[in-house]
Amino acid sequence: MHALPALSEAKENINDISFDWVVDKNFASVPSWHPLVDKIITTDHRNWKKQFFSKDTRESLRHVVNKLNEGNYDLVVDMQNNLKSAFISYLIKHDVIGMDAKSAREFPAHLAYSNKINVDKRLHAIERQKELLGKALGYKCKKNNVNFGALFKNFVKPNIELANEYIVLVQNASWITKQWSIENWQELIRRIEEKGVPMLLPSGNLEELERAKEICSISDMAQAL
């Protein structure tokens, strides 16, 4: 999500630009939301980590390496700058641009990059990725220019009546270890309910929806989406 505005701003500066996007298969829908993304190449980091030396992992990696090196790219940029993305950058037979040692999210991800760019770590992730791509492509980023460029027409609009003021509680997370307990969410809902503010809990799949419904079951002011 954080990289989408960087693509939109690149389009404002380079009219005929387009992108291929490498992403973990669990998040493959995200780049499909942006009209500038031509091809999506998926990785399978979670299974690779679980059984790195297995035959299936070797075959999966070989397939990904072939896909990564099919395109004749003008530029390859690692927007994530962590160890997982650096591993993918290492597999690409092309010079890769990424953040330098002082800027990268995880050490020593910067070692995978041929060209290293300094980006202020104090910036929000969206601004960091915009600045990285802007420096890589040679244009100056605009502050507070955040356009996700998502094709919202492809999303189903919830059939709900929104109050003038409401709170969105994002209870879902990609890793179980990052999830707050249902009991903690319900305690938060009770406290917000005391303030008289309605709450919405969005979900991205059926499992998340069931969890959101359980969390909301204690209050008529909380709604699972």
Residue map of PLM features:
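Catalytic machinery of carbohydrate-active enzymes
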Residues: 1-225
